[in-house]
Design a protein with these regions (language model features):
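Noncatalytic alpha-helical scaffold of FAD-dependent oxidoreductases
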Residues: 1-175
């Protein structure tokens, strides 16, 4: 996908497109969500510093192939850090990998993605919570740090003193 987008952008093929069309390419491919079959997919997205991205991704992809659980789609992007309290952005790169859920491989995928979390944390990386359904509280605590989580929980208590605003993602990672 990245190569096709790059080649399509070379002169004389330049063109304007909307922000959404550029960033959410698959939303414009009819029926793309059916490509993974009835079981669907699990997406895993990591953000790694420039210095450690290649080595960490190499380790993750080797593990994926050793387990017989290859990513069927991968998208990489360049990122810069931001000042958001729970930011996933680093001065480096992200890789979003889509894994097919089929034939009873869900538990094996979950186990492998938790190993990916350990690789990412060891490499100084971060996660995109909304895409990483298998990330556990321990991995979140290791990459954000106790101070950041404490600050977030204080902010949550101040803005939501009755605890009415809580998603499953919040309960899984922070409660």
């Amino acid at each position: 996908v990245n190569t096709a987008k790059y080649l399509a952008s070379l002169p004389p093929h330049t063109f304007r497109q909307s922000h959404a069309a550029f960033h959410f390419l698959l939303d414009y491919v009819p029926g793309w969500e059916r490509a993974f079959g009835r079981g669907g997919l699990i997406q895993y997205q990591s953000f790694l510093p420039r210095e450690s991205a290649e080595a960490a991704w190499t380790e993750m992809l080797k593990l994926s192939h050793q387990r017989g659980l290859p990513a069927y789609l991968g998208v990489t992007k360049r990122h810069r850090p931001d000042r958001f309290l729970l930011s996933h952005a680093v001065d480096g790169f992200s890789a979003a990998l889509d894994f097919k859920v089929a034939g009873g491989n869900r538990l094996a995928l979950s186990s492998m993605l938790q190993e990916f979390d350990r690789i990412v944390v060891a490499a100084g990386g971060r996660f995109y919570f909304a895409k990483n359904s298998e990330t556990q509280p321990g991995a979140t605590a290791r990459f954000l740090g106790a101070r950041t989580i404490s600050q977030f929980k204080r902010l949550k208590r101040r803005c939501d003193p009755d605890g009415l605003l809580a998603s499953n993602l919040y309960r899984r990672l922070f409660a």
